[in-house]
Structure formats: C-alpha cells, structure tokens
C-alpha cells in the first residue's frame, strides 16, 4: 500500500532482508495501525478472520473468501479508540500481513476506511442527498485526500544486534485535522 502514513521497515542488504523476511513469515513483527472507518461498532473490540485473495471480478482489488475456498489466511484484530457517530477511530493489529488486509477486512464487515475509493469508503458521499452533510464530507475528503490509515507502531528483533526494537509514529497533521472536524 502506498497511501498509508507512518512507519515501514526496509533493508540495506540481502542478509538483513532475509532476517526481516523470516520475522514477517513467522508473524513475530508487531504492527499496529490506526484507521478511521465509517459507521459505529456495537462491540469495543473484535477479530476478523477471512482468507484474502485477488477479486474474481476486479484483479486490481483484493477480496475476502469467507468460505476459505481461495486466498490466504488473514487475521485482523481491532479495537475501538473513539466513536465519533458516523465514523469510528480504531486500532488494528495484524496477525498476518496480506495485501490491503485492513482495508479489505474492514470493508467486509461493513466499515470501510474513510475516503478509501477502492473499497467503498467514498460511497457515503455518493448516496448523500442532504446538501449540508454532503459539503461537510467533501470538506473532510479535501483535508485528507487519501484513505485514513496510519502505521502507528512497528516492533521487531533487530537483524544485526538481535535487540527487540519498537518504533512509534504520531498521527500526521492531515489525520489530526480530519479528527478535529468530527
């Protein structure tokens, strides 16, 4: 994904890359994201389990195969951080790391990411007829013209020193500005 803000890890050489890749494969890397999603949750936290693979109808999109017939096993744990009425701020912890995992899983349970055109996070605007609300949403989209996803925390064993390292990143200005509007 090239739209989220926040942390990422990269390797300078093949040996470092191999050591990091093992940690990703073994699911030992800690990754936490903050997302602003549409709708309100009944629960305070939950787990989404559903295989993710390429959509049979649109190869540019990923798709949840709930029956497990295709795709790769994917697990996302989520927790409500704050409710704003029409939108909810959630923290997502990945147990697996599939392409667009948070975006696809959240859309699958009916809570697409704010302003995520690919997975339905812009649909609220298309169905809105109340002019004042429509203008408010358009203004919010202008403040944050990308989907509302931020890689907040990244932890792993350092490939050279074998120390456990943990990095955190505060919400960027556009994300903070968006939250103040709600």
Functional labels for PLM-detected ranges:
Residues 2-182:
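RNA pseudouridine synthases
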């Amino acid at each position: 994904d090239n739209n989220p803000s926040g942390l990422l890890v990269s390797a300078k050489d093949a040996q470092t890359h191999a050591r990091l890749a093992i940690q990703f494969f073994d699911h030992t890397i800690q990754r936490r994201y903050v997302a602003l999603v549409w709708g309100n949750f009944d629960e305070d936290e939950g787990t989404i389990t559903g295989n993710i693979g390429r959509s049979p109808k649109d190869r540019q999109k990923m798709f949840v195969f709930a029956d497990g017939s295709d795709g790769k096993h994917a697990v996302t744990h989520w927790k409500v951080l704050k409710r704003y009425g029409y939108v909810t701020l959630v923290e997502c912890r990945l147990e697996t790391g599939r392409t667009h995992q948070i975006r696809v899983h959240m859309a699958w349970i009916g809570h697409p990411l704010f302003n995520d055109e690919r997975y339905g996070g812009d649909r609220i605007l298309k169905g809105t007829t109340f002019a004042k609300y429509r203008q408010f949403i358009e203004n919010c989209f202008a403040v944050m013209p990308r989907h509302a996803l931020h890689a907040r925390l990244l932890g792993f064993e350092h490939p050279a020193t074998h120390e456990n390292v943990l990095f955190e990143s505060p919400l960027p200005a556009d994300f903070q500005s968006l939250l103040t509007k709600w």
